[in-house]
Amino acid sequence: MTAMSLATLETRLDHRFGDKALLEQALTHRSHGARHNERLEFLGDSVLNFVVAAMLFERYGKLDEGDLSRLRANLVKQASLADIAQRLDLSQYLRLGEGELKSGGFRRPSILADTVEALFGAVFLDAGFEAARRVIVRQYQPVMAHVDPKTLGKDAKTLLQEFLQGRKLALPQYTVVATHGAAHSQQFEVECAIPALEIKIVAPGASRRAAEQSAAKVALEAAQAVLPAARAARKSGKARKTAQLSLPVAVAQEVK
């Protein structure tokens, strides 16, 4: 890992480390050596939860404590942190042991998410709380811009699952239909299928999860459009059937 590549990561974080050793430790998985990032991850997790809680408190004045807690949980969960790692292109900076490298650990959401928290902890130790808060706010601004308080920050896959379960329909099926590019920068294409509604959506993503989320988002929009149309068609069919059944009675009355 070169100083130049670390400088690129620092630019993406918008923080220059006074102690470069902290940055290197934050990027080091336990499989790589004894000086790994788990303690930094523990610290970063606490700082992250506080900063996100403050952001939500200021942004959503009408949400109660329960909704704020659920929204925060969705924003700091593994999947959300892995998305931030993707934006930082963090996989190319990870320091992994040989076994983790061979098994594709640089793409594993749990490792990516833990490293993001470790980076937040490293910034806190390097320059204090305000620096860590600034870095976290910067990384969460794109996330917060798309948060719908009505759905409490749930991702597209969760919303699609709840939508289908609420209508007693089978859960969607996700299938990787194609991969492109080198191992460290693969692009995925994933199909989201809802057989009961005859919906099939294929979407790309920088990771399998990202592609699944993109496909689920479009599939949810399609399902929301299909079901009202299907209900309207059924109602229309029932109305025609009722009219047909009542027609002979009306004719008989006119004959009389």
Swiss-Prot record:
The keyword Kinase does not apply. One of its GO terms (molecular function) is metal ion binding. InterPro entries: dsRBD_dom, RNase_III, RNase_III_dom, RNase_III_sf. Its main location: cytoplasm. Homodimer. Digests double-stranded RNA. Involved in the processing of primary rRNA transcript to yield the immediate precursors to the large and small rRNAs (23S and 16S). Processes some mRNAs, and tRNAs when they are encoded in the rRNA operon. Processes pre-crRNA and tracrRNA of type II CRISPR loci if present in the organism. This is Ribonuclease 3. It comes from Bordetella pertussis (strain Tohama I / ATCC BAA-589 / NCTC 13251).
